[in-house]
Amino acid sequence: MMEDSKAWIHRQWPGHPPVTHSVIKGNDIPVIAAMANDYDLVVMGTQGASKFKDIFLGSTTNGVCKATETPVLAIPENASYCPLRKIVLAVDDYEVTGKKVLDPLIELADLHDADIKIFHTDMGTADLGVDPIIGMYLAGKEHSFHYAATSLKINDSIHEFVETEKADMLCLIGRKRARINNLFHRSVTKREVFQTEIPLLVLTDIAVITDF
C-alpha cells in the first residue's frame, strides 16, 4: 500500500522532492511525535468527530500537536489545494518568546506572498491584548492586526473572522507550560483540529510559563 501511494504521488507530481516512507509498530501519538523531532514540519489529515474513524484521526492529530515541538499542519478531509493568499494568525495575550516561533508561518507566507491577519479575541478587563513584539517579528511582511470584543466563544469568534476574511489557512500558537489557567492552547487548538474547514498550522512556543 505504501509503495502504491508513493507511485501515485510520483505520477501526480513529477519532479517533486524525494518521498520516503516508513512503517513503524507502536502507539501512534508517541511514535509520530518522536519521528517529528527529525523533521521541520508534520503534515496530518484530520476529520470531524461525527464517527469513530473521525474521532480517531482528530484525536491523533490533536495529540501530536500537544506532544511535539515540531510545527503541525492539519489538513481537513474535504480541503482542496488553493494558493495561500490570506493566513489568519489567532493569538492569545501571552508573549511570543522568539521570532523562531513564527518562522514556519513566515516561510509559508513568503512562499505564497500571503497576507497575515493577526486576530485576537478580547476576553475582558484581565486581557493583556496582543504582544506588540509580534509586529516586530513580522516587519517587512504584509500583515495587519484585528481585534474582537465579543460574547462569542473563542473558537466561534475565530471562525467568524476566518469566514469574513475568506482566509486560506488558520495558524495557532500552542504553548508548553507548567501551570497555567489558560484555555487557549488546550481547548481552542483541540476544537480547531476537529472543526476547521481550512488547513490549520499549529506552532509551538516552548517557553515554560508558570502563572498560578
Please give the residue ranges for each predicted region.
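N-terminal membrane-insertion helices
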Residues: M1-K6
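Structural beta-alpha unit
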Residues: A7-V42, L138-K190, F194, I198, ...
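Intrinsically disordered or low-complexity boundary/linker segments at protein termini
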Residues: W13, L41, T46, S50, ...
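Extended, hydrophobic interaction surfaces within ordered domains
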Residues: K25-K66
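Glycine/Thr-rich phosphate-binding loops of Rossmann-like dinucleotide-binding domains
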Residues: F52-K53, T97, I180-N181
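Charged helix-capping and loop-helix junction motifs
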Residues: L57-T60, D103, D131, F184-T189
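Hydrophobic/aromatic ligand-binding patch that stacks against planar heteroaromatic rings
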Residues: G63-C65, L108, R191-E192
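Small/aliphatic-rich secondary-structure junction motif
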Residues: K86-A149, E163-L170, Q195, A207-I209
